[in-house]
């Protein structure tokens, strides 16, 4: 059996050989079914699935997105099981499947850390969830999580720079940012060394390559400049301004959730784990427990399914 997490931008699969992350945007012509079929052909016999990609704006509503994802999986794995927001597995498309990936992670981790909490920061969002009172988490939609502070909509790759930072000091002058989608969090985090080539899996804002120079050029456009106009130092200042704002936003949310719940341990997963674990005095899941932190929901749903066997 394999574990599958279908996001709006990335498809994450965990099998016996490890973690596999595929850039697979659901708002375009998606090769979702074709990618999953490769694992069937490689010998996988079934799949345990979670999703959050039903929210992609290529779908009319969540129901259409859920049906699309379930159909894509069942083309290869007709007996696949899907974890829902009710904390149960399902075999058919239903509303409970919407955005249940984080709940699967919590359901798995709380068994080892009953008074802990999770920060799972990936390409697009940060899930910040205390494990205490698990029953209160059942049925919590993304909207409710936003209201509770358990979902912070920023990630290591896909957040537009101008959504969190509005200015940087360049050549000694405060320089406001344009609000065009010129650069993203992937560019800022790449330039500062928080991620590398393997982690920067999302499409770039200009469709060009991932390299230090390309990222610096995209960052420079944030202040309506070519890289030659503000130099590398200017572009790095833009990256630093963004990452400072992003880190404050996430760390403040973690601190509040921890204090409110009285949590004693913060478990950090996702591609942002190496950056954020030290900032929140947390435990990086991969190094501490061997859990595949880059694809935590896919790993978690697989383990939950195995416990049922």
Regions found by a protein language model. Give the residues of each.
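Nucleotide/phosphate-binding catalytic cleft detector across ATP-hydrolyzing
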Residues: 1-119, 129-309
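Glycine-rich GHKL/ HATPase_c ATP-binding element in histidine kinases
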Residues: 126
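Glycine-rich, mobile lid/loop segments that gate access to catalytic sites or pores
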Residues: 122
């Amino acid at each position: 059996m394999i574990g599958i997490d279908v996001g709006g931008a990335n498809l994450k699969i965990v099998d016996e050989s490890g973690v596999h992350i595929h850039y697979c945007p659901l708002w375009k012509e998606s090769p979702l079914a074709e990618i999953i079929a490769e694992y069937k052909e490689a010998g996988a016999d079934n799949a345990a699935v979670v999703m959050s990609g039903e929210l992609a704006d290529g779908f009319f509503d969540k129901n259409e997105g859920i049906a699309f994802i379930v159909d894509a999986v069942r083309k290869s794995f007709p007996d696949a099981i899907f974890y829902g927001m009710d904390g149960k597995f399902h075999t058919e498309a239903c509303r409970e499947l919407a955005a249940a990936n984080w709940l699967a992670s919590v359901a798995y981790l709380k068994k080892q850390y009953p008074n802990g909490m999770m920060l799972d920061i990936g390409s697009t969002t940060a899930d910040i969830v205390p494990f205490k009172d698990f029953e209160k988490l059942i049925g919590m939609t993304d909207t409710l999580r936003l209201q509770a502070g358990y979902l912070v909509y920023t990630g290591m790759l896909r957040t537009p720079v101008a959504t969190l930072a509005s200015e940087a000091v360049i050549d000694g002058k405060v320089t406001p940012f344009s609000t065009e989608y010129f650069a993203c969090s992937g560019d800022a985090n790449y330039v500062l060394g928080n991620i590398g080539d393997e982690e920067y899996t999302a499409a770039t804002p200009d469709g060009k390559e991932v390299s230090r120079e390309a990222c610096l050029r995209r960052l420079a456009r944030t202040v309506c400049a070519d890289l030659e106009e503000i130099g590398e130092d200017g572009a790095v200042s833009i990256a630093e301004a963004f990452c400072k704002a992003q880190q404050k936003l996430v760390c403040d949310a973690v601190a509040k959730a921890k204090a409110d719940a009285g949590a004693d341990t913060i478990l950090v997963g996702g591609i942002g784990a190496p950056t954020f674990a030290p900032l929140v005095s947390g435990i990086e899941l991969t190094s501490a427990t061997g859990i595949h932190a880059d694809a935590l929901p896919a790993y978690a749903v697989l383990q939950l399914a195995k416990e049922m066997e």
